[in-house]
């Protein structure tokens, strides 16, 4: 679910002027990128998983880049050695590397460590019940593992869902720009309708469904037509086996809808 949070922080950095445009080139903020297409990648391509970054998201191979992200002591160095090998903005390819680079970009643009930026601009504004924390790659480097490792509880995750459900507004205050939130909850590519800008999408049962999705089966599911948030922290039971919303999400949606209709 951390990927949605990093995307939200990107929207806030845009609103505050740290990022001038979502069409800005990433290389203007992170100059030492690699690969044939490094100078073409836009900020929004990172958040929409269309950057063309060379990446294997499989965790079964301990030498894959995503596996290394979990145990390496310098995640920034790892990311700066991953090349961009495809033309950006055209093809969806889910990549934790995109999110890690995006949080680094926010740090470079704002001059503020990502966890501090997120806490100040978003987390503290939604009145959380408890503290939360991001994991670091190591004490020596102190890089935030933004691709995965945000730790909170169901009630406070639900608050983040409510923030999106209310188009970025919390208790009358506009925390994130409403147009950005609406754009995030709209398919980014015409030929792939399951992902927006940092948000998973589905039209199950003819409802417009948006969700934050975690690696092990954690979900915050938002259904605007029903003014409904479904939060689930636990292990995934069902997988569709391909890109898109996992099958267990649809089970939780059906169960929740049956409860409110009874």
Where does each model-flagged region fall?
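Flexible glycine/proline-enriched surface loops and loop-helix/loop-strand junctions
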Residues: 60-61, 83-88, 98-100, 139-146
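Solvent-exposed loop and edge beta-strand segments that line ligand/cofactor-binding
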Residues: 87-94, 144-151, 212-213
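Active-site helix/loop module of the DD-peptidase/beta-lactamase fold
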Residues: 16-54, 81-83, 110-147, 152
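Active-site Gly/Thr loop motif
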Residues: 130-131, 135, 181-231, 239
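Active-site-proximal alpha-helical segments within enzyme catalytic domains
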Residues: 98-105, 146-169, 218-234
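Active-site SXXK
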Residues: 1-22, 46, 102-106, 157-160
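Short, gly/Ser/Thr-rich active-site loops of penicillin-recognizing serine hydrolases
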Residues: 241-262
